[in-house]
Amino acid sequence: MPNETHKDDNLLEIKDLHVQYNTDDAVVYAVNGLNLSLKKGEKLGLVGETGAGKTTLALSILQLLPKKVGQIASGSIKYDGEELLGKPDSYMLGLRGRRISMIFQDPMTSLNPTKTVGEQVYEVLHLHFPNLSKDQKQDKVDRMLQLVGIPASRKGEYPHQFSGGMKQRIVIAMALIAEPELLLADEPTTALDVTIQAQILELMRRLKDEFNSAVVLITHDLGVVAEFCDNVSVIYAGRVVEHGTVEQIFASEEKHPYTAGLINCIPDLTRDEKRLKPIPGHMADPRHIPTGCCFADRCPHCMEKCRNTPPAMHEKDGHLILCHLYDTTKEAE
């Protein structure tokens, strides 16, 4: 969650993070003062539209931003109490895949078409556990493939011989073979049909319990979050605008207007309306940080102060909302 007092329980702690892309035309402000923390074993959903800053945040944690263009301008990223910003490449190489793994949106960006799937899972294990014997490594590879639902008899096949859902299973095997403490899953089910999507989410849930890993699930789909996560952080224009448990996000009458808009975009056969209600307008231009609330131009409740004054974060029972709507509530209390 964005503000957490029990620091010893936190596996990941991000404070006032600012990330930008320095292009030839302009500076793109992708993450703007973001705060986030994650406990050991927690399943956290990061929700927001394309361009909200979700993937940039994940790449920043692993220091995989595009070189020369991507830049962490300021802030802090601590992992298990240790500051990651400023760490040398050698340190981060040991961290990636071993303690923190990432599943990318397109499995083919992680798979080498010229190597068998067994070789690729084996290579990850060998990189982080070179002292294991070849037989020990092969046994672990076979077991991991079996855990993700791929028969060991197919480990000699190449990525193109597998369906999209099976490719994603292979990528999950590669991400978890070293038993990391944290898994960053970036839209792992986006390109899959509903049936396969449910299977992949169930697989991730089972493997999360098997290895006791914390998971950050990045998605634009609140329905997926409701199925998988314990807690949710809603991100808009590089900021956390709401954070709470799944129950708080969906059931509470108090919501950030952006969160309410996302929920209205979820198909629901019980509604009287025949059409979904998309959020009007577009994401704020990331080249220009607004003076007030970044959602003001799209908000149905926009007031004058929303355009001129940044909103404060309001908290109630751990439920956090960054919105002027709740200023009067707090003043009354």
Predicted segments, located by residue:
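A short, proline-enriched helix->beta-strand linker immediately N-terminal to the Walker B motif
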Residues: 177-181
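Conserved ABC transporter NBD signature motif
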Residues: 72-83
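Conserved ABC ATPase signature
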Residues: 158-162, 166
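Short catalytic/signature loops enriched in Gly
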Residues: 9-10, 155, 245-333
